[in-house]
A protein has these predicted regions:
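Active-site neighborhoods and metal-handling regions in enzymes and metal-associated proteins
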Residues: 1-595
Length: 595
């Protein structure tokens, strides 16, 4: 079926079930940013493939809301579908909730699958729409009803993460969380975020593409841990090890019945921003719910010394692969046929040669020329274009290694570029260097520091429509909270930067139909000196790959900025050159020369 045919079929099901507007978020049953094929209902209905977006279907309109990363991509993919694009955050553009409040009147009904909407959002919708006399219907997966040949739920094999990689045993992690439960006065802890469960139990899977997680729910009490997952994914030795640490396996969907048995005298801790609304609504009304952040959130984000040291190793391995790729690319572009897709395959080949490489940490963004202006562009056979010996290639890629997860962006000069392009290339690089060199008092958040990355562009009256940085998991999700860099404050999204947190530093500049630039390093937060003013903090770059000096205008940089770049490049040469052949090493020596 075409997108138009799918929407027509969905509207027919809406009529049958008395639903006037149907909400389709991106989420799976666990609030994941990236989801497995089974859960891609929004993509199936709208044809939009971006990782963030919400669709609303009514009888007389269809709309898709997405953020600035995807404006260009969404406009292209929605063309001819009859779906209206709502550019989130733009002036005069209503939010999804504002739109629903305005367009749903007395007696109307909003529907959604309650497993794909958080309890927090569902409560907000119910309160807002109740004022209009609008009802909710949350038990129907209407998109699933019309989805022909829907993929099955993933059930990839589960493995254990050895303590030499994790740095802390499963038993010790569970004991830590139980202590936190005790402090909060909680009798039960309901955990549904897939990366949190994988971190807590030191298990990894493959149920989401490029995200080594296991489709599961978890309930911890003072005496037991119930894991709800597909038993077929667990080998006997993994099950035995889990059982030894007090973890008992139950069928994946059975949690919805289990939570109905919670006693009224028990206090249940869960995060309504993360747990889906159907699960929370199944908990008896007289049970007291403590709505708190997941107790695993900060422990997961603050990497322990073993994890940090392993990440340094992972980034050297990754640095070797990406450096070899850049050398190969600059040597061969214009000489042999290279396209965006074939370049991505070549980079994967270089990564695969590295010890302990597992997989990409996300689908590679290899974007040449005007494609680089699409912040999260993914080449397909239909969009793939050849690389030419001119302009920029933006390569935003990453890998999973046993030692950790990487995420790196380099804007590579493939040939002659204009002075204007170099001006912006240099401005963005200055932002990356300045943020990475920050020293700050403990207690600062990413909001406090974000201006260091944006200032060079802001001075030019320019900006970029995405966050400056995100947390990164340890052999887990490449996007992880709560740490981030952004200039706007958001409720509950302004976490203090703690020792051991790994965060990306990735300002950019994008000119539609022109070019795109992004420079990204991962960095770990560390303690610096302690004075009478308090504990100072700093960052250490983990990523070890040269920035392309062919795009840099040294005269546009301060002496301090040039020194920062030179010092970084000296580190890159020292750590990466021992793993290169003589030709590559000679090239890297020039690529990291002092300016």
């Amino acid at each position: 079926m075409t997108v138009k045919e799918r929407i027509t079929a969905l509207r027919a099901r809406m009529k049958e079930t008395g639903i006037d507007a149907y909400l389709i978020p991106t989420d799976d049953f666990h609030g994941s940013e990236y989801v497995g094929e089974y859960f891609k209902c929004r993509k199936y209905i709208t044809g939009f493939t971006g990782s963030a977006g919400t669709a609303v279907i009514m009888q007389d309109m269809a709309g898709l809301w997405t953020d600035g990363r995807y404006f260009i991509q969404a406009a292209d993919q929605l063309e001819g579908t009859g779906i209206t694009l709502f550019k989130m955050g733009e002036p005069e553009v209503p939010t999804v909730h504002e739109f629903l409040k305005k367009n749903l009147t007395q007696g109307r009904c909003l529907g959604f699958d309650g497993r794909t909407v958080s309890a927090k959002e569902a409560a907000e919708l119910e309160k807002m729409l109740d004022e209009n006399g609008v009802s909710l219907s949350v038990d129907h997966d209407l998109a699933g009803d019309i989805w022909e040949n829907r993929p099955a739920l993933s059930c990839e094999p589960v493995t254990e993460l050895d303590i030499k990689w994790a740095g802390e045993s499963r038993a010790d992690k569970c004991a830590r969380i139980r202590k936190a439960m005790e402090k909060k006065g909680a009798d039960l802890f309901v955990l549904t975020s897939l990366d949190d469960i994988a971190w807590l139990l030191n298990i990894r899977g493959g149920d989401i593409h490029c995200c080594p997680v296991v489709l599961s729910y978890l309930v911890m009490t003072k005496t037991e841990i119930r894991l709800f997952a597909n038993e077929k994914a667990f080998q006997p030795d993994v099950l035995e090890a889990l059982e030894k640490d007090g973890v008992t396996l139950f069928p994946y969907d059975s949690i919805y019945e289990y939570v109905k048995t919670f006693k009224k005298d028990k206090k249940v801790l869960l995060c309504k921003k993360k747990v889906n609304s159907r699960l929370v609504s199944n908990i008896p009304a007289d049970t007291r719910i403590l709505d708190e952040e997941n107790l695993t959130l900060l422990p997961k984000a603050t990497k322990n010394p073993v994890e940090v040291e392993n990440e340094r190793i992972a980034h050297i391995r990754d640095g070797v692969a990406v450096t070899k790729f850049i050398y190969w690319l600059k040597k061969n572009v214009g000489r042999i046929p290279i396209t965006e897709l074939s370049a991505a395959e070549k980079l994967y080949e270089f990564r695969s040669e590295q010890e302990n490489f597992i997989d990409n940490s996300f689908d590679p963004i290899i974007a040449y020329g005007k494609h680089a202006a699409i912040v999260h562009y993914f080449a397909t056979p239909e969009t793939d274009i050849p690389l030419e010996p001119s302009g920029f290639l933006l390569a935003d890629t990453g890998g999973h290694y046993k030692e950790g997860t990487t995420d790196i962006t380099r804007t590579i000069v493939t040939g002659p570029t204009s002075e204007e392009e170099k001006k912006y290339f240099t401005a963005v690089l200055r932002g990356t260097l300045n943020l990475g060199a920050a020293r700050f008092l403990h207690g600062c958040t990413g909001v406090n520091l974000d201006i260091l990355a944006r200032q060079p562009l802001w001075e030019m009256g320019e900006d970029f429509k995405h966050g400056t940085g995100h947390g990164v998991g340890y052999l887990l999700n490449v996007h992880e909270g709560p740490n981030s860099f952004r200039w706007k404050t958001v409720p509950g999204g302004n976490a203090v930067l703690e020792e051991g947190m790994i965060t990306s530093d990735e300002p950019g500049y994008y000119r539609e139909d022109g070019f795109g630039i992004r420079h990204e390093n991962l960095m770990v937060c560390k303690k610096a000196e302690k004075t009478e003013y308090g504990q100072f903090m700093c960052f250490e770059f983990l990523t070890m790959v040269p920035f392309d000096l062919d795009g840099v205008v040294p005269e546009l940089m301060s002496v301090r900025e040039r020194n920062l770049l030179n010092d970084y490049h000296a580190q890159v040469y020292e750590k990466i050159s021992p793993y290169l052949n003589e030709e590559e090493k000679e090239w890297l020596k020039d690529a990291t020369r002092a300016i």
